[in-house]
Every structure is written in C-alpha cells, then in structure tokens.
C-alpha cells in the first residue's frame, strides 16, 4: 500500500507512476485518497478543538461551583454535553473517512521504479542478459514434455482429473523422486546462500493475503475455504513474509533471509490456449521461494544478490536462460521492479518463465506494518520486502525433459544425480 505521506507530498509523481503501470483511473483514485484525508483531518481538528474547549469549561465549572454559582455551572455543563455529542459525530466522520481512504488505497497498485521500462504488455519487456551456452540441438523427432511424460509413464494427468480435476497431476515413480530432488537441491542452495528454511502453513487468513497484496487484487485467482474464511497459498511468499507482520525489527538484524518450499495453488481463471498443455500451467505446483527483508538503503543490493542466486541455479541445471526486465504494464500489482527468468524449451520452441524476482520497496511493508528501528537515532521506518522463485518446478521440469531427451531416456543434470540416485528419467523404476 502506498503511504499517505508519499501520495500527499509527491502527488504528480505517484499519478505518473500509476499511469506507467497502466492503472486505469489513477488520478481519480489519488484525488479520492486526498479528499478522504482532508475530511479526516478537518474532523480531527474540530475534535481536538472541542476537547480543548471542554477542558477549559471543566475548569470554569469547578471554579463556579466553589463560588456557589451553581446555576451558571449547570448552563456550562449543558454546553459541555453538546460538545461531547458533537465529538461522537466527528469521530464517526473520521472513522468513515479513514475506512473509505483505506479501501481506495488497497486497490491502488505499487508505482514502478524509475528503471522500469515503459510499455503495456509483455511485448515491451527488455532482455537484459542471456546465456545460451546450454542451448540444445534437437532433431525433428524431438518430443514435447507431455509426450515424454506419457512415453516413460512419469506423470498421470488423467488420474489427477479423477481425483481432483484438470491441473492437478499425479507424479509417479522416478518423477516423484525427481521432484523431491529438485526441492531438496533448491533448499540446500538457498541455505548455502544464508537463507533460513521455513516450513510454513499452506493455508492463510485474510489478513495475511491483504498484507502481501494478493487480496483484494488476486482474490478471484485464489482457492477460498469459505467456511473458515481461509485461503490456499499461491506462493510461500505469503506466509513467510507475514511472519514479520506487525513487527518492529532491529536494523542490526537486517537483512532477514528466509526460504521455503511449498505446494502452491492458483485457480488461474481464464483461457491460455497452448500454455495449458502438460506442465505449462497447473492449479497445483511446487516451488521454493526466497524472501528478504531489508532497509531502503540496501534493498536493491539484496535484489541483485537474489538475481545472482537464481541465475546460479539455472547454470547448475545446465539450462539456457535469459533475464527479462518487465515493463510497467506487465508487472505485478505489488512490485516496484521485477525481473523474470525464462528457460528455453527446445521441443516447444518457446521461452518458459521459471522465476520472478521482485523488490516491493515499502509497499508490502506498509500493509504489513513491518518496520525497523535505526541503530543510531532509534527512528522507526518501513522496511523493504523482496521475494523470488528459486525455483518453480513445473516449467523447470518441462525444459529439463525436453532439452535433455536422449534415446536412453531423460538425462538428469549432474548436480541432481546425488539427490535422486539415478542418471536417467525413464520407465525403469527401481
């Protein structure tokens, strides 16, 4: 959530930032916030004035009673009663203005960092780095991953439909072990980089969804347990970041680095055409998330370190990849800046997103009331929050399957062999 201070002091910059993000009605939304704030402040001033007047009148009543001027004192008591009645009305005005202002603020996205390119959609994203060292050269008979999964009996999509519905695959034999190997590898690499592992709940309350910005923006894409008003998590970012909701951290303890594996659940409402085939787009997937909490001065250093971490994983998995700096119109609701990592899927002849690494600056922290205390002057300030996928499994698996297919089976990247205990993914389960 944008701070009221930022909106009040840098109104035009905020409006231009929202327009860069292609947020419709940017000026109107900002003007609503300022109008509700004006109503709230005016009511507060009147309330403060009333309180001051009541204190003065209370002293007069005391003096008059001592002097025996009871009738005059009673008249003043009537005035005090009227002021107290006015106080109640003013408090109601303040509360309503605050609620209305918060409602509008929750629907306003974050503004982009100055380095974010202009653009409305993915066509304006900018490739800022690429490594094609491991680009495979496959023949015309190369199979897409969904055909490979069927050939080697590694995933049963029909069984998932029987048990739950489309988008909930069942992993079998070596593929189940391969999934577990990837999760362990990603977590171990995060631990080596200084991240403390968390095993979070997969279900969160409404306050947690609001805190990280999935609510109200992404409510339609989340699975909602209506009876208990709980939500299945779309990413471990939600429970892990909410650990620090309503906390005041010490500057000396920053940056805070956490990682977590979780299953992730997304309704993914809408039609995506070819994107839905195989593992390209699922309702349930597995992912390791890295989260950092830092000071405003150091958050971009943290962000670059997170980019380096994700890039290191892709190198170790021997995959071709590139980094996309997202344009304003293609960024998430909460991001200030975001880089997507995509790997090349050789049989599909397309790039697949496998990670997003974002700096939210103070946007999430303002919703979360996540703050830190300066070591020297003890001043309390909003933290910056960051997160990234390190990595998301389904599309990583898809690219490994397609890029590493051989007549003997799917060659397992060398770094994963110690984790899964075999060198090829095939139908020979031992």
What are these regions (language model features)?
Residues 1-134, 154, 158:
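N-terminal alpha-helical targeting/anchoring segments
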């Amino acid at each position: 959530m944008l701070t009221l201070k930022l909106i009040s002091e840098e109104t035009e910059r905020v409006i231009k930032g929202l327009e860069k993000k292609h947020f419709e009605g940017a000026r109107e939304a900002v003007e609503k916030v300022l109008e509700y704030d004006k109503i709230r402040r005016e009511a507060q001033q009147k309330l403060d004035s009333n309180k001051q007047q009541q204190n003065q009148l209370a002293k007069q009543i005391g003096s008059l009673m001592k002097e025996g001027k009871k009738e005059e004192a009673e008249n003043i008591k009537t005035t005090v009663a009227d002021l107290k009645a006015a106080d109640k009305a003013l408090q109601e005005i303040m509360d309503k203005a605050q609620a209305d202002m918060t409602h509008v603020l929750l629907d306003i996205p974050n503004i982009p960092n100055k380095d974010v390119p202009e653009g409305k959609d993915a066509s304006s994203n900018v490739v800022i780095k690429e490594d094609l060292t491991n680009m495979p050269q496959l023949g015309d008979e190369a199979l897409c991953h969904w055909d490979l999964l069927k050939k080697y009996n590694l995933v049963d999509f029909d069984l998932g439909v029987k048990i739950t519905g489309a988008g909930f695959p069942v992993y079998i034999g070596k593929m189940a072990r391969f999934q577990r190997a990837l999760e362990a590898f990603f977590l171990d690499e995060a631990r080596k980089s200084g991240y403390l592992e968390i095993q979070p709940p997969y279900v969160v309350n409404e306050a947690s969804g609001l805190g990280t910005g999935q609510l109200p923006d992404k409510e339609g894409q989340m699975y909602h347990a209506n009876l208990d008003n709980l939500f299945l998590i779309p990413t471990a970012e939600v429970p892990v970041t909410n650990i620090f909701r309503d906390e005041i951290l010490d500057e000396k303890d920053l940056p805070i680095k956490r990682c977590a594996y979780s299953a992730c659940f997304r309704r993914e409402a809408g039609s995506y055409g070819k994107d839905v085939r195989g593992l390209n787009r699922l309702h349930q997937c597995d992912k390791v998330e890295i989260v950092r909490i830092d000071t405003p001065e150091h958050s971009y250093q943290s962000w670059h370190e997170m980019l380096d971490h994700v890039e290191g994983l892709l190198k170790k998995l021997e995959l071709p990849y590139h980094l996309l700096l997202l344009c304003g119109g293609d960024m998430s609701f909460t991001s200030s800046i975001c880089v997507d990592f995509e790997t090349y899927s050789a049989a599909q002849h397309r790039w697949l997103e496998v990670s997003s690494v974002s700096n939210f600056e103070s946007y999430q922290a303002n919703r979360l009331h996540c703050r830190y205390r300066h070591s020297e002057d003890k001043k309390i300030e909003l933290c910056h929050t960051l997160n990234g996928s390190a990595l998301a499994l389904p599309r990583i698996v898809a690219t490994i399957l397609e890029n590493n297919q051989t007549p003997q089976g799917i060659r397992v990247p060398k770094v994963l062999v110690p984790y899964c205990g075999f060198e090829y993914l095939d139908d020979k389960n031992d």
